[in-house]
């Protein structure tokens, strides 16, 4: 193991000088002897100097401090010992429950599986959330993005998905908190404990208050743990909240490393960094990784380079809309903007496909009629259009649903609705079976039977 010394410190970026014959490789982990801070080599500048990012605060560092080269990339504990534990970017426990005690550690930088090892699946993963199962169904082993601006419900949707899938699907999950609020991480931990699923989840946090190096690498730490479960032949769920903060951390590091920024100030390597992460999130012939990623949309602009780069990698996109949230309809999923590759009659079956497209057709027609209604009022519409509007408003309300994880706020018990019941309910509305029921009865309920029951008491 070679030793060097710190020659320059600029925030989270540290330059270390080594003897010319013992320069560390890119991605090698270095350890500052005083204080034990870990650095990761990013560039070799020549003359024995390497430029590193600090995986921890650089407060208290000074030039001349001794640095040791470990000779290997950052390695983190993997396997079943990580379940039920909270770890940081280096795989160190931060839940005061003692050592992880894993038998094996894996490097966080790994190659994506080769083409011949990868496999495709068209099997659906039922989430119990009506709007998602109907309009943008998830594939087992697929990638899902939850897109939304600030405060429209990305984290709540993700917590509900984890709760439903962990309880109904009973597989292992890995949750990577990338640059999000520490309070949410804490809420999430307690939510998992109360639902008795904590022993099936590994939690890796690199939150908002941490240096950019931690936020950039924590997604890879979580992914490495998920890959281990997959390679043991399991079907694992990998949740990332929030993929935008991963990009943002890359932007901060890129600027500190002296690279020229590209569009909107993002790093020039944006597409490559996203690809490195996303290509590893894949299913192989041994096991599968199903990933759900929350994607913050800056200023509600889906054409921003960061969400736009993410779109390309996903099988399903769930778009959360501020307009729908302002109507008080939660989950605020936009049924006209959300898409899924699985919504194909050969995958979901003809009935599901027809009902989903029928729902979208009626909502699209209602959207077109809104201008006419605003100018001329409902009375000017034809009888057919009045019927479309009435059914569309019922569908809009029936797409809302009380969540288990939001019981504290809403006061209504959460509902899990099977795909069969979801299709049956929407099919009934489309065919006019519930035209006699007032639209208020469709708001914040589970299955269609509850609507009928609610209408009786109105």
Curated annotation (Swiss-Prot):
Keyword ATP-binding set for record: yes
Function summary: Produces ATP from ADP in the presence of a proton gradient across the membrane. The catalytic sites are hosted primarily by the beta subunits.
Keyword terms, alphabetized: ATP synthesis, ATP-binding, Cell inner membrane, Cell membrane, CF(1), Hydrogen ion transport, Ion transport, Membrane, Nucleotide-binding, Translocase, Transport
Broad class of enzyme this protein falls into: translocase
EC numbers on record: 7.1.2.2
Subcellular compartments: Cell inner membrane
Membrane association type: Peripheral membrane protein
Stored Gene3D superfamilies: 2.40.10.170, Bovine Mitochondrial F1-atpase, Atp Synthase Beta Chain, Chain D, domain 3 (1.10.1140.10), P-loop containing nucleotide triphosphate hydrolases (3.40.50.300)
GO CC annotation: plasma membrane; proton-transporting ATP synthase complex
Reaction catalyzed: ATP + H2O + 4 H(+)(in) = ADP + phosphate + 5 H(+)(out)
Protein name as catalogued: ATP synthase subunit beta
Alphabetical list of SUPFAM superfamilies matching this protein: C-terminal domain of alpha and beta subunits of F1 ATP synthase (SSF47917), N-terminal domain of alpha and beta subunits of F1 ATP synthase (SSF50615), P-loop containing nucleoside triphosphate hydrolases (SSF52540)
Family in the record: Belongs to the ATPase alpha/beta chains family.
Cited NCBIfam families: atpD
MF annotations from Gene Ontology: ATP binding; ATP hydrolysis activity; proton-transporting ATP synthase activity, rotational mechanism
Positions contributing to ATP binding: 148-155
Lineage of producing organism: Bacteria, Pseudomonadati, Pseudomonadota, Gammaproteobacteria, Pasteurellales
Record keyword Membrane present: yes
């Amino acid at each position: 193991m070679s030793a060097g010394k710190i020659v320059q410190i600029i925030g989270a970026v540290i330059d270390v000088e080594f003897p010319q014959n013992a320069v560390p490789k890119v991605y090698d982990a270095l350890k500052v002897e005083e204080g034990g801070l870990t650095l990761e080599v990013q560039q070799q500048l020549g003359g024995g100097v390497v430029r590193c990012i600090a995986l921890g605060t650089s407060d208290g560092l000074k030039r001349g401090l001794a640095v040791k080269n470990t000779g290997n990339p950052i390695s983190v504990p993997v396997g079943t010992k990580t379940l039920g534990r909270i770890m940081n970017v280096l795989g160190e426990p931060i839940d005061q429950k003692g050592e992880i005690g894993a038998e094996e550690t894996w490097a966080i930088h790994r190659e994506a599986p080769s083409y011949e090892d990868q496999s495709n699946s068209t099997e659906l993963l039922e989430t119990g959330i009506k709007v998602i199962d109907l309009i943008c169904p998830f594939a087992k082993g697929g990638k899902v993005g939850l897109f939304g601006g600030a405060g429209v419900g990305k984290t709540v949707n993700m917590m509900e998905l984890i709760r439903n899938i962990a309880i109904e699907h009973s597989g292992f999950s890995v949750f990577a908190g990338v640059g999000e609020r520490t309070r949410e991480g804490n809420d999430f931990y307690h939510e998992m404990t109360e639902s008795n699923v904590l022993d099936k989840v590994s939690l890796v946090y690199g939150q908002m208050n941490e240096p950019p190096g931690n936020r950039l690498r924590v997604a890879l730490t979580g992914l490495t743990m998920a890959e281990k479960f997959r390679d043991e032949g399991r079907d694992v769920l990998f949740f990332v909240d929030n993929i935008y903060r991963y990009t943002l951390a890359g932007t901060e590091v890129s600027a500190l490393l002296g690279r020229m920024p590209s569009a909107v100030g993002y790093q020039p390597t944006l597409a490559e960094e996203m690809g490195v992460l996303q290509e590893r999130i894949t299913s192989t012939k041994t096991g599968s990784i199903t990933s759900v990623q929350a994607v913050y949309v800056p200023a509600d602009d889906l054409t921003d380079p960061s969400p736009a780069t993410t779109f390309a990698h996903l099988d399903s996109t769930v778009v959360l809309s501020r307009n729908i949230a302002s109507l008080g309809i939660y989950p605020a999923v936009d049924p006209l903007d959300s898409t899924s590759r699985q919504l194909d009659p050969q995958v979901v079956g003809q009935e599901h496909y027809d009902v989903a497209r029928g729902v979208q057709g009626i909502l699209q027609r209602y959207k077109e009629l809104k201008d006419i209604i605003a100018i001329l009022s409902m009375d000017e519409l034809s009888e057919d259009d009045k019927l479309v509007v009435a059914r569309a408003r019922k569908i809009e309300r029936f797409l809302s649903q009380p969540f288990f994880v939001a019981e504290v706020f809403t006061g209504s018990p959460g509902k899990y609705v099977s795909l069969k019941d979801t299709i049956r309910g929407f099919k009934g509305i489309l065919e006019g079976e519930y035209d006699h029921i007032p639209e208020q009865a469709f708001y914040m309920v589970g299955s269609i039977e509850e609507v009928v029951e609610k209408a009786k008491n109105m």
